[in-house]
C-alpha cells in the first residue's frame, strides 16, 4: 500500500483496455483493397479450406480477413469493407469481410440469415 507522498510523486496509472481489432482504429468498419485471395486450413479438430484475403486497409494496416458464405467473387484489387470478428479455428484471422457492399457481392441463393451475407429479400 503506497503512502500519500508516493502517490503524489507517482500517481496511479489507469488500466488501459486492449482492443481485439487494432487495425480498425476504433471504427466499426474500414475499407481496404485485397492484395491476395487464398485458402488456408483450420486448426486441429476441424478440416476444410477456408477462404481468406490479405487486405491493405485505409488505416495503413495489412490484415488477413475471412470471406464468409459459400462462393465469392473477391480477387486481387477488389475493394472490400472489413469488420471486426475473429474466426476461432483460423489463427491470426481477426477480421471479416462484409458481404453485399463495395466489390464483395452477397451470397447466391441464400434464404435464411440473409442480412449477414448481403442478400436482398427474394420476390
UniProtKB/Swiss-Prot annotation:
PROSITE patterns: RIBOSOMAL_S12. Pfam families: Ribosom_S12_S23. GO terms for cellular component: chloroplast; small ribosomal subunit. GO terms for biological process: translation. It comes from Citrus sinensis. Its main location: plastid. With S4 and S5 plays an important role in translational accuracy. Located at the interface of the 30S and 50S subunits. Keywords: Chloroplast, Plastid, Ribonucleoprotein, Ribosomal protein, RNA-binding, rRNA-binding. This is Small ribosomal subunit protein uS12cz/uS12cy. Signal peptide: none annotated. It is found in: Plastid, Chloroplast. The gene is rps12-A. Belongs to the universal ribosomal protein uS12 family. It comes from the Eukaryota. The keyword RNA-binding applies. NCBIfam families: rpsL_bact. GO terms for molecular function: rRNA binding; structural constituent of ribosome. The keyword Ribosomal protein applies. Transmembrane segments: none annotated. Part of the 30S ribosomal subunit.
Amino acid at each position: 500500500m503506497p503512502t500519500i507522498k508516493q502517490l503524489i510523486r507517482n500517481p496511479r496509472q489507469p488500466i488501459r483496455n486492449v482492443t481485439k481489432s487494432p487495425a480498425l482504429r476504433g471504427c466499426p468498419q474500414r475499407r481496404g483493397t485485397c492484395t491476395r485471395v487464398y485458402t488456408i486450413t483450420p486448426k486441429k479438430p476441424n478440416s476444410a479450406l477456408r477462404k481468406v484475403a490479405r487486405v491493405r486497409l485505409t488505416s495503413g494496416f495489412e490484415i488477413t480477413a475471412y470471406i464468409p458464405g459459400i462462393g465469392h467473387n473477391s480477387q486481387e484489387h477488389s475493394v472490400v469493407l472489413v469488420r471486426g470478428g475473429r474466426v476461432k479455428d483460423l489463427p491470426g484471422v481477426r477480421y471479416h469481410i462484409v458481404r453485399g457492399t463495395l466489390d464483395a457481392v452477397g451470397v447466391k441463393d441464400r434464404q435464411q440469415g440473409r442480412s449477414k451475407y448481403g442478400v436482398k429479400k427474394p420476390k
